[in-house]
């Protein structure tokens, strides 16, 4: 599933190309996504001007000049790409936006776990994103904030940093990578972390996410950016997906365990605490 770096990469690839364009037509090809497409989607943003393209957590947001925004979640296999005017519709295209420059913006989702909504812009944070925690790069992510969130939590730190009510956008891949960089065992209880470990973890999360964004995200199977290009952070993964291989830091063997049904990868030598 695309995480923060993938959505940030998608945003960066689309923003300059979309701002200022007009949505001339919206074609709903297939509404059989996990959350059924609303017929209003075809009319609420019709003939509107694109003001901005931004990200909140793992959501892509496109703002229009009629006080509405398009909210896109890629789910497991969603793709949101720019295509030329002569683009031929594909089997799993769900929504096609015709743009004023002749190009098409396509939402394609093979596994249909994605979602796409239109929503009043000024109500997004209050009603749509009201349960989300803070962004990893926000100044609000401090030792005091995270310590307060962790001090009563007797559950694995890996689960806690993946909780979008605490920090948004840190999915399975980047949780494993961040904990390895911070040298923290993924099973360690959140309330057992020392202050210096919490500070190291915040720094590690930011460092890993920054490197992933710079590399264009991680493509394990489906992810591509708005230009239909994959991400290359896969080549920089230190532990994720490397079960049985040597740790790149100490040569110990990478171990795979499960947390809440998800695969976790770590090094027992580097992540001793």
Curated annotation (Swiss-Prot):
A Gene Ontology BP annotation from the UniProt entry: base-excision repair
Binding site for DNA: 92, 111, 153
Cofactor requirement: Zn(2+)
PROSITE patterns: FPG_CAT, ZF_FPG_1, ZF_FPG_2
Active-site residues per Swiss-Prot or TrEMBL entry: 2-3, 58, 262
Zinc finger (FPG-type) in chain: 238-272
Cofactor annotation remark: Binds 1 zinc ion per subunit.
Reactions performed catalytically: Hydrolysis of DNA containing ring-opened 7-methylguanine residues, releasing 2,6-diamino-4-hydroxy-5-(N-methyl)formamidopyrimidine; 2'-deoxyribonucleotide-(2'-deoxyribose 5'-phosphate)-2'-deoxyribonucleotide-DNA = a 3'-end 2'-deoxyribonucleotide-(2,3-dehydro-2,3-deoxyribose 5'-phosphate)-DNA + a 5'-end 5'-phospho-2'-deoxyribonucleoside-DNA + H(+)
Signal sequence annotation: none
EC number(s) from the headed UniProt entry: 3.2.2.23, 4.2.99.18
Gene Ontology MF terms: 8-oxo-7,8-dihydroguanine DNA N-glycosylase activity; class I DNA-(apurinic or apyrimidinic site) endonuclease activity; damaged DNA binding; zinc ion binding
Keyword line: DNA damage, DNA repair, DNA-binding, Glycosidase, Hydrolase, Lyase, Metal-binding, Multifunctional enzyme, Zinc, Zinc-finger
Subunit note: Monomer.
Protein's job: Involved in base excision repair of DNA damaged by oxidation or by mutagenic agents. Acts as a DNA glycosylase that recognizes and removes damaged bases. Has a preference for oxidized purines, such as 7,8-dihydro-8-oxoguanine (8-oxoG). Has AP (apurinic/apyrimidinic) lyase activity and introduces nicks in the DNA strand. Cleaves the DNA backbone by beta-delta elimination to generate a single-strand break at the site of the removed base with both 3'- and 5'-phosphates.
Annotated PANTHER family: FORMAMIDOPYRIMIDINE-DNA GLYCOSYLASE
The family this protein is said to belong to: Belongs to the FPG family.
Name by which UniProt lists this protein: Formamidopyrimidine-DNA glycosylase
Species: Rickettsia rickettsii (strain Sheila Smith)
Record gene name: mutM
